[in-house]
Every structure is written in structure tokens, then in C-alpha cells.
């Protein structure tokens, strides 16, 4: 059955009753606006929106459940980069009228599965038809304690640069199945002083310079130390993108303890020092090939 045969109201009737609601949801999906009761003790409200567009972030032949998973996890990876806890999500789906209803159902199943992984309540959204490709926008709201918020703009000269996991070759499978490093980020900010952090969505060659520019510093990188996925080369680690790992800067005074504690807490996930932040006037980093840049 096509979407044009089912119609918006009947489609929403099929989808909305399955969406996960937490105890803090007062009025959820289906109303004009969602109403939530934020938990006490959180200092900052955190908001993020992200999109997934057919032909850019996924191909139509991709498994719809995997596409739904990725669409939800993309903004959650940004929450990991700020050490924030996601709690509510809004979904906007734009699809051609000829889209199979079964595809949409599987897509929403992927959304629900990803949301449940981090106890996120899907509280509403919007649907619309289009003559173009399928596109989805996911907006997420959450919270973070004031003393645990991390941005990309507070890196300091002399900081060590670390990256979680392994880089390169994500397009083969990982980009549809990754899990944001929220648990790892929360552990880091609870136990260590993290000066700056960013998630590697567009590639190390794009995201590392972004962090350095935001912090008004330069960087030097040890290419031989980059942790590579199986079959990936240094160029892949720098340029492929879609890794969704964390890149962060912290004081070298805590590096030994950080690495030792990390291995004990996350023995199956590598943490690698790949370089350091230096004064802008002393930049010695190679000209990194860029990752993915929209509109170019």
C-alpha cells in the first residue's frame, strides 16, 4: 500500500500509539503541542535538531529500520559531544505519496528502537508529502548539569587530543548501526576535566579544525597514531566521516590516569591520544584533506 492510499490521519493512527512515552510526558504525540515536565535538578536545557535525507545520508535500498535508527542517533551523538542527556524527541517525516507504507512502518520501528536505547520519549512531530526524496528531521530536547556541560570552544594550548573507537570505513556498515558515546561522555565529565569535545560526523579532517578554530588554537596530529578500522587507511580515517566517535581535549596532567581508568571502564572500546593543541602562531599540523561538507 502507498501513502497516497492510506492518507495522513490513518498513517498517524498506526504510528503514534506505538511511540515510547516516559513518565515526564504530560501530553504526547497527536496534540497540537507536546507538554512535558522536566526533571528537577537539571541546570541547562539542551536542544538539537538533525536531518537525514535520501541520497545524502542514506540510500532508498537501505533497510528502513536502519535508516530510522540512524535518523534518531545522529542528534543523540551531538548530545554525547556536550555530555548531555536526551529526553524528548520530535519527528518530521517528508515523503513522496508513492512511498510504501511498510517502509514507513519499519522506519518508525527503527526510530522507536533507537529512542528506547536512551530512554527518549518521542512526543510528536509532523508529516508532509513531497515530490522530492524522503527526508526526516529529528529534534531532541534534554538536560545537562551546569558543571558537566562541554562545548567545542574551550580547548587550551597544551591539551592532549583523544579520540574514542576507530576511524575510517564507516560507509561499509557502521554509519547505519552506530551507538552514540553518551555513556562514555557522561563518564568522562564525571571523572575528569574535559576542556572541549566534538563528535566526528563529517570526518576528522573537518571536525578537528572546527574544534581548533572554536577554541582559537592550532593543533598538531600524529597520523601514525590514528586508530583505524579494519581495512581503513589514514586517508579514510581523516576524510570518510560518519564515524560518530568523540574527539576531545583535556589537560596532559591527567592523561595517564585517564587512559588507565578508561581501559578499566571500557575495555572493549579503544581510547587513543592522537595529538595536542598548540598556539595558532605555531601551527605544525599537515593540511588535512577535508571530510564531508554540505553544499559543496
Report residues per predicted region:
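Extreme N-terminal cap/leader segments of soluble proteins
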Residues: 1-63, 82, 91, 106-115, ...
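Glycine-rich anion-binding loops of enzyme active sites
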Residues: 2, 45, 52, 85-171, ...
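Acidic, Ser/Thr/Pro-rich beta/coil linker or hinge segments at domain junctions
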Residues: 3, 260-296
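General beta-strand structural signal in soluble alpha/beta enzymes
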Residues: 27-28, 46-48, 121-125, 163-164, ...
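Residue-level signal for inorganic ion chemistry
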Residues: 35, 75, 83, 122, ...
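Small-aliphatic-rich amphipathic alpha-helix that forms the alpha element of a beta-alpha
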Residues: 64-88, 109-117, 205-211
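Active-site-proximal betaalpha loop/short-helix elements
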Residues: 98, 176-243
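Helix N-cap motif at beta-to-alpha junctions
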Residues: 249-256
